[in-house]
UniProtKB/Swiss-Prot annotation:
Phenotype reported upon loss of the gene: Null mutations in F9 embryonic carcinoma cells eliminated distal/subdistal appendages and prevented primary cilium formation. Loss of ODF2 also disrupted two mother centriole-specific NIN dots, while leaving one dot on the proximal end of mother and daughter centrioles.
Signal peptide start and end residues: none
Listed name of the protein: Outer dense fiber protein 2
Location of cross-link Glycyl lysine isopeptide (Lys-Gly) (interchain with G-Cter in SUMO2): K138
Covalent S-S links between cysteines: none
Chain residue ranges for the region called Interaction with BBOF1: 537-701
SUPFAM superfamilies: Myosin rod fragments (SSF90257)
Tissues/organs with expression: Testis-specific (at protein level). Expressed in spermatids at tubular stage V of the spermatogenic cycle. Highly expressed in the cytoplasm of elongating spermatids (tubular stages X/XI). In step 14/15 spermatids of tubular stage III/IV low expression detected. No expression detected in other testicular cells as well as the early round of spermatids.
Species classification: Eukaryota, Metazoa, Chordata, Craniata, Vertebrata
Length: 830
C-alpha cells in the first residue's frame, strides 16, 4: 500500500515487532507540505517473500511534526517498497530535483548552528556598540556646541561691558582736557593782588592734586581695562572657560568698578571746585565792569559840559552825508562779495558732488564684490549639494550591495556597516563645515554693516563741521570788513576835522553871537557819541561771541579727532582679530587637510575670500588715513582762525586808542568852538550843494538796490539749482542702497533655501538609516525563526531514530532494513 500525506499533526501508536514506518524527507528533514506520512498494512493471506510485505489490514500512524513555514504545497512522490508475506513497508523518498545531497550524521550536528549563532551575536554586539558610540559622539558634539555658544555669549557680554567702560573713560578724559584748559586760563590771568594770588595758589594746588588723583585713577582704570582685554583675548584663543578664568574675570571687573567709582568721586570734587572758582571770577569781573561803567559815566558828564551845540549840528550833517556815501560803498562791496561767495559756493557744491559720485562708485564696487562673494557661496553650496547627492547615491548602492551580501553571506554585512559609518562621519564633517561657512558669512556681513554705519556717521559729522567752519569764516570776514570801514571813517573824520580846525578859528567870533542854538546841537552830538560807545560795546560783545564759537569748533574738532582715533583703534582691533581668525582658520585647515583632500576647490575659494577681506581692510585703512588728513586740515584752519581773531583783537585795541585820541581832540575842539560862528553862512551854502549831491546819491542808491535785487534773485535760483542737484544725488544713492539691500535679501533667501535643503537631506538620511535598521531586525528575526525550525527538525530526527529503533528491534528486520534502506549510513549503530 502507498503512503498518504496528511495535513494534521501525525500520531505514532505504540509499535511492536511487526510495526512498519515510512519516511519522506528533504535536505533538512522537511516535508514539502505538512508532516511526513507513514502507513503500515498487515495481511494473513500471503506469506513472507524475501524482504517485501503485503498486508491487507492497514493502519495509519501520525507523528508530531515541528512548525513549517507556509507558502509550500504538498506533493506525492514515488516510494520504495519492501514486501514480506505478512507485512509490507512503503517509503516515499523526495525527488532528486529537491534533494541535492544525501543526509548524513554530520549534517545533524549543531556545531555549524552554534558558530552561526556566535557570529550573529558578535554582529549584534558590534552593531549595538557602534550605535552607542555614534550616540555618544552626537551627545558630545551637542555638549561642545552648547559650551561654545555659552562661551560666545559670555565673551560678547564682556565685550559690551568693556565698550561701556571705554566710553566712560573717553568721557572722563575729555572732561580732564576741559579742566586742564580751564587751569591754563586761570594761570594766564595774573592781574590779581597778593592776597588773591595766595588764595589762587592754594586753589591751584588743590586742583592740581585732584587732577593728579584723577589721572592716577584713570591710568589704573585703563590698566584694568587692558588686563580685561588680555584675559578675553586668551579666552578667545582657548575657547573653553574654566572656573579660574571666570573668577579672574569677576575680580578684574570688581577692581575696575571700584577704580571707576573713585575716579568719578575725584571728578565730582574737581567739578565743584571749578564751579566755585568760576563763580568767584564772574563776580570779580562784574565788579570791574561796574567800576569801568561808572568811570565812563563820569567822563561822559564832563564831556557834556564841554561840547557845544553848533559844532554837533555841523558834525551831524557831515556825518550823515559820509554815512550815506559809506553805505553806498558797503552795498557795492556786499554785492561783489555775494558774487564771489556764490562762485565759491558753486565750486564747493561741485566738489561735493564729485566726492559723492566717487563714494557712489565705491559703493557700487563694494556691492559687486558682495554679489561675487554671494555667487561663490552659491557655487560652494551647489558643490556640497552635489557631493551629498553623490554620497546618497553611493549609500543607496552600498545598501543594495549590503542586501545582496546579507542574502549571500553574513561577512559582507560588517563591511557595509563600516562603510555606512564612514559615510555618516563624512556627512557630519560636511554639515559642520557648512555651518562654519554660514557663521563666518554672517559675521563678515555684520562687520561690513557696522563699518558702513560708522563711515556714514563720520561723513555726516565732517560735513556739519565744514559748514560750521565756513559760516565762522564768513562771519569773521564780515567783522573784519566792518572794522576796516569804521577805521577808514574815523581816519577820514580826523583829516576833515584837522582841515576844518583852521576854519573854526575864524568862525569862533561869529559863533559867539549864535551860542544858544549851538548848545542844542552840542547835546545832539553828545547823544551821537553815546551811540558810538554803544556800537563799540556791541562790537566787543560780537567779538566775544565769535571767540566762544571758535572755541566750540575747536572742541568739536578735538572730539572728531578722538572719534577718529577710536575708529583707528577699532580698525586695529579688527585687524588683530582678523589675523587671529586667519591663523586659527589656517591651523584648522592644515589639521583637516588629511581628511579634506577630496575638497581642494573649497579651500581655494576660502583663501580667495580671505584675500578679499584683507583688501577690504586695506581700503578701510586708506579711508581712515584720508579722514585723519581732513582732520589735520580742519585743525590748521581753526588755528588760522584763532590767529585772525588775535589780529582782530589788536585792531580793536588800536581803535580804542584812536577813540581816546579823538576824545582829546574833541576837548581841543571845544576850546576852538568860539571861532566857528563866522562860518555859518558858508556852511549853509555848502549844505545846499550837498543836498543836491544827496539827491543824486539817492537816485544812485535806488539803481543799486534794483541791481542788488536782481543779484539776490540770481542767487536764490542758483541755490535752488544746487539743492535740486543735491536731492537728485541723494535719491540716486538711496536707490542704489535699496538695490543693494534687495540683493542682500535675495542672498539671505538663498541661504535659507540651502539650509532647508540640507535639513531635508538629513531627514532622508535618517529615514534611510531607520529603514536599514528595520531590515537588519527583520533579518535577525528570520534567522531566529530558522534556528527554531532547525531545533524542531533536530528533535524530529531524534524522534524518528527512536521510532526506527522500536520498529526494527528484531534482528532479521534490522538486517534487511540495513541492507536495503538508503538511510543506512545515517542510522545509529545497534
Amino acid at each position: 500500500m502507498s503512503a498518504s500525506s496528511s495535513g494534521g499533526s501525525p500520531r505514532f501508536p505504540s509499535c511492536g515487532k511487526n510495526g512498519v514506518t515510512s519516511l519522506t524527507q528533504k535536505k533538512v528533514l522537511r516535508t514539502p507540505c505538512g508532516a511526513p506520512s507513514v502507513t503500515v498494512t498487515k495481511s494473513h493471506k500471503r506469506g513472507m517473500k524475501g524482504d517485501t510485505v503485503n498486508v491487507r489490514r492497514s493502519v495509519r500512524v501520525k507523528t508530531k511534526v515541528p512548525w513549517m513555514p507556509p507558502g509550500k504545497s504538498s506533493a506525492r512522490h514515488v516510494g520504495c517498497k519492501w514486501e514480506n508475506p505478512p507485512h509490507c513497508l512503503e517509503i516515499t523518498p523526495p525527488s532528486s530535483e529537491k534533494l541535492v545531497s544525501v543526509m548524513r550524521l554530520s549534517d545533524l550536528s549543531t556545531e555549524d548552528d552554534d558558530s552561526g549563532h556566535c557570529k550573529m551575536n558578535r554582529y549584534d554586539k558590534k552593531i549595538d556598540s557602534l550605535m552607542n558610540a555614534v550616540g555618544c559622539l552626537k551627545s558630545e558634539v551637542k555638549m561642545q556646541k552648547g559650551e561654545r555658544q555659552m562661551a560666545k555669549r559670555f565673551l560678547e557680554e564682556r565685550k559690551e561691558e568693556l565698550e561701556e567702560v571705554a566710553h566712560e573713560l573717553a568721557e572722563t578724559e575729555h572732561e580732564n582736557t576741559v579742566l586742564r584748559h580751564n587751569i591754563e586760563r586761570i594761570k594766564e590771568e595774573k592781574d590779581f593782588t597778593m592776597l588773591q594770588k595766595k588764595h589762587l595758589q592754594q586753589e591751584k594746588e588743590c586742583l592740581m592734586s585732584k587732577l593728579v588723583e584723577a589721572e592716577m585713577d584713570g591710568a589704573a582704570a585703563a590698566k584694568q581695562v587692558m588686563a580685561l582685554k588680555d584675559t578675553i583675548g586668551k579666552l578667545k584663543t582657548e575657547k573653553q572657560m574654566t572656573c579660574t578664568d571666570i573668577n579672574t574675570l569677576t575680580r578684574q571687573k570688581e577692581l575696575l568698578l571700584q577704580k571707576l567709582s573713585t575716579f568719578e568721586e575725584t571728578n565730582r570734587t574737581l567739578r565743584d571746585l571749578l564751579r566755585e572758582q568760576h563763580c568767584k571770577e564772574d563776580s570779580e569781573r562784574l565788579m570791574e565792569q561796574q567800576g569801568t561803567l561808572l568811570k565812563r559815566l563820569a567822563e561822559a558828564d564832563s564831556e557834556k559840559a564841554r561840547l557845544l551845540l553848533l559844532l554837533q549840528d555841523k558834525d551831524k550833517e557831515v556825518e550823515e552825508l559820509l554815512q550815506e556815501i559809506q553805505c553806498e560803498k558797503a552795498q557795492a562791496k556786499t554785492a561783489s562779495e555775494l558774487s564771489k561767495s556764490m562762485e565759491s559756493m558753486r565750486g564747493h557744491l561741485q566738489a561735493q558732488l564729485r566726492c559723492k559720485e566717487a563714494e557712489n562708485s565705491r559703493l557700487c564696487m563694494q556691492i559687486k564684490n558682495l554679489e561675487r562673494s554671494g555667487n561663490q557661496h552659491k557655487a560652494e553650496v551647489e558643490a556640497i549639494m552635489e557631493q551629498l547627492k553623490e554620497l546618497k547615491q553611493k549609500g543607496d548602492r552600498d545598501k543594495e550591495t549590503l542586501k545582496k551580501a546579507i542574502r549571500a553571506q553574513k561577512e559582507r554585512a560588517e563591511k557595509s556597516e563600516e562603510y555606512a559609518e564612514q559615510l555618516h562621519v563624512q556627512l557630519a564633517d560636511k554639515d559642520l563645515y557648512v555651518a562654519e561657512a554660514l557663521s563666518t558669512l554672517e559675521s563678515w556681513r555684520s562687520r561690513y554693516n557696522q563699518v558702513v554705519k560708522d563711515k556714514g556717521d563720520l561723513e555726516l559729522e565732517i560735513i556739519v563741521l565744514n559748514d560750521r567752519v565756513t559760516d565762522l569764516v564768513n562771519q569773521q570776514q564780515s567783522l573784519e570788513e566792518k572794522m576796516r570801514e569804521d577805521r577808514d571813517s574815523l581816519v577820514e573824520r580826523l583829516h576833515r576835522q584837522t582841515a576844518e580846525y583852521s576854519a573854526f578859528k575864524l568862525e569862533n567870533e561869529r559863533l559867539k553871537a549864535s551860542f544858544a542854538p549851538m548848545e542844542d546841537k552840542l547835546n545832539q552830538a553828545h547823544l551821537e557819541v553815546q551811540q558810538l560807545k554803544a556800537s563799540v560795546k556791541n562790537y566787543e560783545g560780537m567779538i566775544d561771541n565769535y571767540k566762544s564759537q571758535v572755541m566750540k569748533t575747536r572742541l568739536e574738532a578735538d572730539e572728531v579727532a578722538a572719534q577718529l582715533e577710536r575708529c583707528d583703534k577699532e580698525n586695529k582691533m579688527l585687524k588683530d582679530e582678523m589675523n587671529k581668525e586667519i591663523e586659527a582658520a589656517r591651523r584648522q585647515f592644515q589639521s583637516q587637510l588629511a581628511d579634506l583632500q577630496q575638497l581642494p576647490d573649497i579651500l581655494k575659494i576660502t583663501e580667495a575670500k580671505l584675500a578679499e577681506c584683507q583688501d577690504q581692510l586695506q581700503g578701510y585703512e586708506r579711508k581712515n588715513i584720508d579722514l585723519t588728513a581732513i582732520i589735520s586740515d580742519l585743525r590748521s584752519r581753526i588755528e588760522h582762525q584763532g590767529d585772525k581773531l588775535e589780529m582782530a583783537r589788536e585792531k580793536h585795541q588800536a581803535s580804542q586808542k584812536e577813540n581816546k585820541q579823538l576824545s582829546q581832540k574833541v576837548d581841543e575842539l571845544e576850546r576852538k568852538l568860539e571861532a566857528t560862528s563866522a562860518q555859518n553862512v558858508e556852511f549853509l551854502q555848502v549844505i545846499a550843494k550837498r543836498e543836491e549831491a544827496i539827491h543824486q546819491a539817492q537816485l544812485r542808491l535806488e539803481e543799486k538796490t534794483r541791481e542788488c535785487g536782481s543779484l539776490a534773485r540770481q542767487l536764490e535760483s542758483a541755490i535752488e539749482d544746487a539743492r535740486r542737484q543735491v536731492e537728485q544725488t541723494k535719491e540716486q544713492a538711496l536707490s542704489k542702497e535699496r538695490a543693494a539691500q534687495s540683493k542682500i535679501l535675495d542672498l539671505e533667501t538663498q541661504l535659507s533655501r540651502t539650509k532647508t535643503e540640507l535639513g531635508q537631506l538629513r531627514r532622508t538620511r535618517d529615514d534611510a538609516d531607520r529603514r536599514y535598521q528595520s531590515r537588519l531586525q527583520d533579518l535577525k528575526d528570520r534567522l531566529e525563526q530558522s534556528e527554531s525550525t532547525n531545533r524542531s527538525m533536530q528533535n524530529y530526527v531524534q524522534f524518528l531514530k527512536a521510532s526506527y529503533a522500536n520498529v526494527f528491534g528484531d534482528a532479521p528486520y534490522t538486517s534487511s532494513y540495513l541492507t536495503s534502506s538508503p538511510i543506512r549510513s545515517r542510522s545509529p549503530p545497534a
